[in-house]
Amino acid sequence: MAGSHISIPTILKVGKNTLENLGSYLKSSGFKNAVLYFGNGLISMFGNEIMDSLKKDGITVLDYMELDTTKIEDIINLAFNIDSKAQVIVGIGGGKVIDTAKYAAYLRKLPYVSIPTSASSDGFSSASASLLVNGRRTSVPAKMAYGIVADTEILKSAPEKFIFSGIGDMVSKITALYDWNFEAERGYSEMNDFAVMIAKKAVNSFVRTPFETIHDDLFLRELVDSLAMSGIANEIAGGSTPTSGSEHLISHSLDKMLEHPQLHGIQVGVATYLMSRVQNHRYIRVNAIFEKTRFWDYVAVSYTHLTL
């Protein structure tokens, strides 16, 4: 039965300079031995700060490395070579390394802590991973994050396209929830009321957040919090239906059609507006948040260069 066992993060720290307190967060949860996976090029950027924080609080780093693969066979090999003394896996970076960390943790039945360096999608909080299986991008079961530590100073320093991608992915919950309800009313699906509530609260809280620019601390905190709640909604529902609907199917099609696809959340955001018009559902709200955040301005420039 979906939802009979639900995992949710124990640690959720979002704000300024949270990275320097990583050691204390792990120590408070009883962890002593950690394995760290960094995204490509990130050890030079964040390695010293993380190592110093862990050392200060008595956390032993058994192993650390940079990773740039999502091949399932590579991750299986990686997982079963993890030191037997490891108590927690920490993934620092974007989608690739977070997916690697959560799948390795899933295979070894270890908790993992997600440290996203951009807020481009809800992947850092979801219990699934997008991996290459026999050369094809495939969604596989993975570990729900034990902890999420997001430093807003790091998030705001990432290229703006990643923030716009997160905005698109977050707003897509509006059309995804409509689709889920549409299916349920016709007997093709069964809704989980609590998952619906969490997903609705996430997107509504986000679109109502007051802000001056998308680099505001409050805006970034709300974006990360809402994306994290989306991942929890999926966990409760036992699948991605609260957060992924027709707009995601359009994005998947674009991935196959375009020579150089846009970031996932950018494509999903554009498809969200299109589907909200088809659904005749909250398209004014969708357009308003995209205008205020300048999402449309970014799309207008970036889509000029697309080729089929």
Positions of PLM-derived features:
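Fold-independent oxyanion-binding glycine-rich loops
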Residues: K16-N17, G39-N40, I92-G94, I115-S118, ...
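Structural motif
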Residues: N33-V35, Q87-V90, P111-V113, Y146-I148, ...
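A glycine/threonine-rich phosphate-anchoring loop and its flanking beta-alpha core
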Residues: L107-A202
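Conserved small/polar residues in nucleotide/adenosyl-binding loops
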Residues: T304-L308
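Solvent-exposed alpha-helices and their adjacent loops that cap or buttress functional pockets
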Residues: S4-H5, N81-S84, A105, T138-K143, ...
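A short, small-residue-rich loop immediately preceding and capping a beta-strand
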Residues: I82-A104, R108-A119
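Active-site segments that bind and position negatively charged phosphate/pyrophosphate groups
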Residues: F194-W296
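ATP/NTP phosphate-donor binding region
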Residues: M1-V88
